[in-house]
Swiss-Prot record:
Its main location: nucleus. This is Exportin-T. Keywords: Cytoplasm, Nucleus, RNA-binding, Transport, tRNA processing, tRNA-binding. The gene is los1. It is found in: Nucleus; Cytoplasm. tRNA nucleus export receptor which facilitates tRNA translocation across the nuclear pore complex. Involved in pre-tRNA splicing, probably by affecting the interaction of pre-tRNA with splicing endonuclease. InterPro entries: ARM-like (IPR011989), ARM-type_fold (IPR016024), Exportin-1/Importin-b-like (IPR013598), Exportin-T_C (IPR045546), XPOT (IPR040017).
């Protein structure tokens, strides 16, 4: 059988094996894994001499591992595995072996041994550590750990055991954690002294002999220190050994692998400081270890000091030391923050903070971002502590300026692009993203500094910005773009201090001293020659700042032409990233300065003309064959078009300002519209023939038309009807847009993209056309709700219709009356189609809710009569039927709740005046009663309230179920308000007894309905049902 298993492993692992044979081999090995006796043959395969190939031995041991972890090996048999593996280890690792196992095999054995430790150390293998330690000696006569192969394996297992039971980053179940804690307790009580002694001895005996052994020993000490007695590590013997290894940092040249030993020694100190202790003990520990001196010596070592600004600079060591500084300072600040620590402890912490401040600044200002990032947590903690005490005693803020100022200067300096950065390079996108993330984190720190001492921050930023603009004035384009970018970035951040309620000004004057400074900075920036901003990064910053502080221009209107001229240059930028971003920023700027830009409308329209040409490009395929979506890349054709739309909106905004006469508005609008109309006309025939590019071109054209309309009107559907529609001649121009869109839609309504664009245009045209659009509503519905429209499309259009109803309720009745039945028939067909997957189910639920929302919009806007008009009455039964169905849907409580809301509203609308006090409607206007509706509510709607709780799977304690029941209770209270005693009598005589309810419960329910108001009964009904269900 051994040969059979070995053969199967060889076949499975050979890339050239026949695929059928390979599949059979995999099946065989999978069966072997679950075979209770499979592990035995695999253990033999692994330990046999002469040895099988590495892949056979690796897979064989893997089978043993999985069998042990799956519980296929009983405790007694685990002892057999232990004996087999230990015999192998003594034979192969217990002596000088010319061909040791590979690292992957060693790791696999260590994994198995670690599992056996977990299973047997508590009971069955109490000599575990003695047995492993015996491997570190060449013979029983050895007086020192003289077997390097055995030592490496012993340390490999030691480190694996920490990962198994001590590593806090490993996620464990409660049971696993309890077991880990038990094993740690056993080690501490049985073997810890012995293990710690072995580390000391190995470090001492091999300190200069084998870097791998020394590094693994240090890793073991560093990892285990977190859960063992600190005295086993912090003692003179061990510390002397650690200091010896730290001494390697003083070497100018290290042999290969030696730097790992040095870094591991620093990490031991980091782990010691990271160990949980009382603040008093931790401060004493920092002082005892003399960490200030250690860090100073490391910082002054050749790799970090002499090599600092050279290519030899050791960033790994810098990051390692930075970790030590970070964890130490975090603990110092923690001691300072705690109110419960002694005065002596606080004094020690204060002294340590002063000692470590140079170390913080040294690594925080390191030119390598990964080193700087390492100490950001401790800088953040320190600044947060200073902010906390400054709030308690503002006078202390000034005292701490000696700490704050150098940190602030370091923050600002680190925000500068370094000399090696090349902005916009495709190959450097990761570096750019990481730098921007670092800037973001540094920006947070700067805001904390500002909150501690605003004046200090103001002076520092003013100095950087002022000096930079002075240099710009003198040297112009020769100024390093990185310096200008830094100044602009600081201006952008400064708004966090200067801007209040979205503006630099309050009642016409700057908000505060910071706002005054920022106004000065803005004057210097805008008055600088834009041609000096030669780098794309600074050009983008310039635009971002103008938009962020647009309120500045409302009080310096003489500068608006200068800024607009700059923007009009930048919207034609040769770099796509700058150009497309500038389109968005231009739209933002003119929107915020709308009242001041009408006088340049013609100039702007003419200047933008070449950028308003629409050129649809089909998505290109990525390297994996998938189409790139617009979100995939900012430079994709889709993303560029989405940015281009901002220009159409900007034109609409500028052309529609009150200072532009109506005839000019029409002229400018038509200069943009006519080319688009011509393009649509040209592409309509090929689009009908399913030419994909022509269809996309029509989509883009319609989106552009809708976006131009959005620029002309501020009104958003669903808020209220436009307070003042554009001039009639402007609206007339946009009627052409509506007509052109409808013509395209009617011809291409099977295209999802065209429908999507048309729906967008429709929502935007409402704002410029107002009620003029209503007569076209049947055509819009016919084009937007087709046989191929998805439920999602229907739901979105229903939402739009809600807004139309709200905006034009006084004018829409006759149109709504004419289109309601065919419209609802399409919605019903969407609801009736069976969903085919999760996405479908989500869309169906959304469509149901939007349908109910639509009915509520009709009823709430006093248009309920349209549902029961002569034309739509044949549809009434279907409407009620769908609502009844939703009200009984136990799978969708949200929809059920809405269904009861709609029924209650129908009752309020058509049930006539309230005949009981405290009716459902309160002071709402009463609508004319629908004859027979009172009886309809009693016999048809009332039983619905009991249908859902009668479902066997209904849980009356569920929070959402209670909400549905409260709504059902509201419907019952509405029926009672409209029908009074007739309803109570019906409940008492027929409905409740018919459900099998006893006389006492009937009287309780009827009494509550007659006695309680709406709020009271909505609370009563869920609790009544809960008692019935108990």
């Amino acid at each position: 059988m051994e040969e059979q298993v070995a053969n199967a492993i060889e076949i499975a692992g050979n890339p050239t094996s026949d695929q059928t044979l390979k599949a059979q081999a995999f099946d065989y090995l999978n069966q072997l894994r679950t075979d209770p006796s499979g592990w035995q043959v695999c253990l033999t395969l692994f330990t046999k001499t002469p040895q099988y190939s590495e892949i056979i031995r690796h897979v064989a041991l893997e089978v043993v591992n999985s069998a042990a972890q799956a519980g296929l090996i009983d405790p007694q048999a685990l002892g057999y595995v232990r004996d087999g593996l230990m015999a192998y280890l003594r034979q192969v690792y217990g002596q000088d072996n010319v061909t040791p196992d590979s690292t992957s095999i060693q790791n696999k054995i260590a994994q198995t041994i670690t599992f056996l430790f977990s299973a047997l150390y508590g009971n069955g293998w109490e000599t575990f550590f003695d047995d492993l330690l015996s491997l570190t000696y060449k013979s029983s006569a050895s007086t020192s750990h003289d077997n390097p192969l055995g030592i490496v394996f012993y340390l490999r297992v030691i480190n694996a055991i920490h990962e198994e039971i001590g590593d806090v980053l490993v996620s464990r179940s409660r049971t696993e954690q309890d077991k880990a804690n038990l094993l740690k307790d056993l080690i501490r009580s049985r073997d810890m002294q012995k293990i710690a002694s072995s580390w000391q001895q190995i470090l001492s005996e091999w300190r200069d002999g084998n870097d791998t052994i020394v590094e693994m020993s240090l890793r073991a000490v560093g990892s285990w220190v977190s859960w063992i007695d600190i005295g086993l590590v912090v003692n003179q013997t061990t510390l002397d050994l650690l200091f010896q290894q730290l001494g390697r940092a003083q070497k100018a040249e290290l042999r290969e692998g030696e730097e790992k030993v040095r870094d591991a020694a620093v990490d031991v100190f980091t782990e010691i400081i990271g160990k949980k202790m009382k603040p008093e003990d931790k401060m004493d520990m920092i002082i005892f270890l003399n960490l200030d001196t250690i860090v100073t010596q490391l910082s002054n070592s050749p790799p970090l000091h002499e090599n600092r600004f050279t290519f030899k600079y050791d960033t790994d060591l810098a990051e390692t030391v930075a970790k030590l500084v970070n964890i130490t300072v975090i603990d110092i600040v923690r001691a300072l923050e705690q109110d419960t620590v002694t005065a002596d402890c606080k004094a020690k912490a204060t002294g340590l903070l002063q000692a470590f401040l140079p170390h913080i600044l040294r690594y925080f200002s390191d030119e390598y971002d990964e080193v700087c990032s390492t100490v950001i947590p401790c800088v953040s903690d320190l600044l947060s502590y200073l902010r906390k005490i400054a709030k308690v005693n503002p006078a202390l803020a000034e005292q701490h300026s000696s700490i704050l100022l150098p940190i602030l200067k370091a923050i600002i300096a680190k925000m500068r692009y370094d000399e090696t950065s090349s902005w916009g390079d495709e190959d450097d996108q990761t570096d750019e993203a990481e730098f921007q993330e670092l800037r973001k984190r540094l920006g947070v720190l700067q805001q904390i500094v500002a909150s501690v001492n605003e004046q200090l921050c103001m002076e520092a930023v003013s100095e950087v910005v002022g000096n930079t603009f002075e240099s710009l004035r003198q040297s112009g384009a020769q100024l390093d773009w990185r310096d200008l970018d830094l100044a602009l970035h600081e201006m952008f951040l400064f708004g966090e201090v200067a801007v209040r309620a979205g503006s630099l000004y309050s009642k016409g004057v700057p908000n505060n001293a910071a706002a005054e400074r920022l106004v000065e900075m803005m004057l210097k920036m805008v008055e600088s020659d834009i041609r000096s901003f030669t780098h794309p990064a600074t050009q983008l910053q310039y635009m971002e700042i103008c938009v962020r502080y647009s309120s500045f221009f409302q009080y310096h209107t003489h500068l608006i032409p200068t800024v607009l001229e700059s923007f009009l240059q930048l919207v034609h930028h040769p770099i796509k990233k700058v150009k497309t971003r500038s389109w968005y920023l231009f739209q933002r700027l003119v929107k915020q300065l709308r009242t001041h830009v009408g006088n340049v409308a013609q100039t702007v329209v003419e200047a933008l003309g070449d950028l308003l040409v629409i050129n649809a490009e089909l998505p290109t395929e990525g390297s994996d064959g998938d189409e790139m979506s617009s979100e995939d890349h900012e430079g994709s054709a889709d993303a560029v078009f989405n940015s281009q739309l901002y220009l159409f909106e900007a034109v609409g905004i500028i052309c529609s300002t009150p200072t532009v006469p109506a005839d000019k508005q029409v002229l400018y609008a038509q200069s943009v519209l006519n080319p688009v109309f011509m393009d649509m006309e040209k592409n309509l025939a090929p689009a009908k023939a399913n030419d994909e590019r022509a269809l996309l071109q029509i989509h883009h054209d319609i989106m552009a038309l809708g976006t131009l309309a959005r620029g002309f009107s501020d009104w958003m559907p669903g808020t209220s009807s436009p307070a003042s529609l554009p001039a009639p001649e402007v609206s007339e121009a946009f009627m052409q847009v509506s007509e052109a869109t409808l013509v395209a839609l009617e011809s291409l309504k099977t295209s999802f993209n065209v429908r999507t664009a048309a729906r967008f245009a429709f929502s935007r045209l409402i704002g410029v056309l107002g009620s003029r659009i209503l007569p076209q509503l049947p055509r819009w519905i016919d084009g937007l709700l087709t046989q191929t429209s998805s439920r999602d499309e229907m739901a979105l259009f229903l939402r739009l219709l809600d807004q139309v109803i709200f905006g034009f309720k006084s004018e829409i009745y006759s149109i709504l009356d004419a289109l309601l039945t065919p419209f609802l028939q399409r919605v019903f067909s969407g609801i009736a189609d069976a969903p085919t997957g999760t996405d479908d189910e989500v869309q169906l639920a959304e469509l149901k809710r939007e349908y109910l929302n639509f009915l509520l919009a009709v009823l709430n806007n006093e248009l309920g009569a349209v549902i029961i008009s002569e034309r739509n009455q044949p549809m009434f039964e279907t409407v009620i039927g769908t609502i009844e169905h939703f009200a009984k849907d136990i799978e969708d409580f949200t929809t059920a709740k809405m269904a009861f809301s709609v029924l209650s509203k129908m009752g309020s609308s058509w049930g006539g005046p309230d005949i009981t006090p405290e009716g459902a409607n309160g002071a709402a206007p009463q609508q004319q009663a629908l004859p027979g509706f009172g009886q309809f509510m009693i016999t048809r709607l009332s039983p619905l309230c009991w249908a859902l709780p009668a479902t066997p799977s209904f849980n009356s304690k569920d929070a959402q179920a209670k909400q549905v029941l409260a709504e059902a209770g509201g419907l019952q209270r509405t029926i009672y308000a409209k029908t009074g005693m007739e309803y109570l009598q019906y409940l008492r005589d027929r409905e409740l007894p018919g459900m099998g309810m006893g006389a006492d419960l009937v009287e309780e329910f009827v009494g509550a309905l007659g006695r309680l108001d709406m709020k009271g009964f909505r609370q009563f009904f869920p609790s009544f049902i809960q008692r019935l269900s108990a």
